[in-house]
Every structure is written in C-alpha cells, then in structure tokens.
C-alpha cells in the first residue's frame, strides 16, 4: 500500500509541476519582452511614456534613461536569469529529459531550489523596476504613473514557481519517510515468516493466533 501511495504521489508531482513551470516560463518570457510595465504621464506637458526593463517600443514612447541606472541594469540581469532558470526547470521536468538528466532521489530537492531561485530572481527584477520608477518620480517631479498588467502577470508567475518548488520540496521530504515505513513493514513480515519456517522445521505447528496473523499479513500485502 505504501508503495502504491508513493507512486501516486510521484505521478502527481511529475504531472502538475511541469504544467506550473511551463506556464510560469511563458509568463516570464512574455513579460520580459513587453515594454509597457508602467505608464508615465508628465503633468505639465501631458506627455505619456511607458517604462519597462527593456526598451523595445515601436509605436509608443519609451522612457530611455541615459546612462542606465543600477536598478535597470540589475533588474535586467535578474529577469534574464529568471528566464534562463525557468527554461531549465521546465526542460528538466519534461519526460524526455530523463535521457539527459537521470532522475535521482535528490532531484526533487534540486528542482525545488531552482524553482524558488527563479521566483526570487523575477521578484527582485520587479522590485528593482519599482525602485527605478520611485527614483524617477523624485528626480523629475510631477509624474503620474499607473501600473499595467505585466506587473500582475509577473506576480502570478512568481507564485507558480513558489508552488512548484513547494510541491517538489514536500515530495523530497515525504518519500524517504514512506520508504522507511515500507522497509520496516517488510522486515517485520520477513521476521514473521522466518519464525514460522523455523517452527515448522522443528516439527511444531503455529498456533491459531499465529496463523490468523500470517493470513492477515498476506491479505494486507
């Protein structure tokens, strides 16, 4: 029974976690190339600008600070790191990846660490861009800003990676416990069978209670 539960838990984790990481990877990838994170409006000239970590505006005006602030530089580094780690996590979780990365008993722990680190990188990129907007408002004066959908979508992507990492971590913590319980149960059953075999070899017969215990153990198995 424990073995079946172990397999069911592994099947659940290896089914839901790739879905979470794949969706999180797509979210981070789309948000990273989308420039409209924040909408800025100059109250004096009524000019409208859009701000993101990367400047790739086409038909709209992007805010292009020169030189680049430390917030933008670090934000780009963390966001690109999140994209790379999200891709690695998603690739490892795919079924065909077992040919390249053999699944060991520590893989759940490694995947949990990568998932948490991916979420942390994306969160730091979000915070650094927010600090850039705050510094911009203090420097340029009257600027109105409104947060656009990439902020909320990226926050949801961070949540997905936290959930995926938590599932992998729980799997890593629970499986050894089930393995120990299964081993203990198997040792008790082997000890009981050995006792009955020794008793029969000496010419004795097991009591009715021992027979009932053996039948019950076989039924459970």
Curated annotation (Swiss-Prot):
Keyword Nuclease: no
Membrane topology: Multi-pass membrane protein
Record GO cellular component, one term: membrane
InterPro entries: TMEM225
Membrane-crossing residue ranges in chain numbering: 14-34, 77-97, 109-129, 147-167
Keyword tags: Membrane, Transmembrane
Compartment annotation: Membrane
PANTHER family reported for this sequence: TRANSMEMBRANE PROTEIN 225 (PTHR36477), TRANSMEMBRANE PROTEIN 225B (PTHR36477:SF2)
Name of the molecule in the record: Transmembrane protein 225B
Source organism: Homo sapiens (Human)
Gene label: TMEM225B
